[in-house]
Amino acid sequence: MNLTPREKDKLLISMAAMVARRRLERGVKLNHPEAIALITDFVVEGARDGRSVAELMEAGAHVLTRDQVMEGIAEMIHDIQIEATFPDGTKLVTVHEPIR
């Protein structure tokens, strides 16, 4: 299987998001990379499902709460910028203050 660097990145994010979901199910608080991966995966999959940029910007800020991440993680992440493929092309989605 020959994957482009972008496809490899998408696959890595998807796998990290799966690990993060399993940890949340067990009640384990997420670290920085896990939180980023989970929110990124949510936006990428939402774009694939046909949701709008504005909708994903808003919804992406409600994927995780402060109680679901390790102490200090919410303060470390001010914005997440995700390049996602929508039905009408690739767009940049910025989620402001994603962990509230």
Curated annotation (Swiss-Prot):
Pfam family, one: Urease_gamma
Keyword Transmembrane helix tagged: no
EC number(s) on file: 3.5.1.5
A single MF term (Gene Ontology): urease activity
Places the protein is found: Cytoplasm
Pathway: Nitrogen metabolism; urea degradation; CO(2) and NH(3) from urea (urease route): step 1/1
GO biological process: urea catabolic process
Record-stated family: Belongs to the urease gamma subunit family.
Protein name, as recorded: Urease subunit gamma
Organism this protein belongs to: Sinorhizobium fredii (strain NBRC 101917 / NGR234)
High-level lineage: Bacteria, Pseudomonadati, Pseudomonadota, Alphaproteobacteria, Hyphomicrobiales
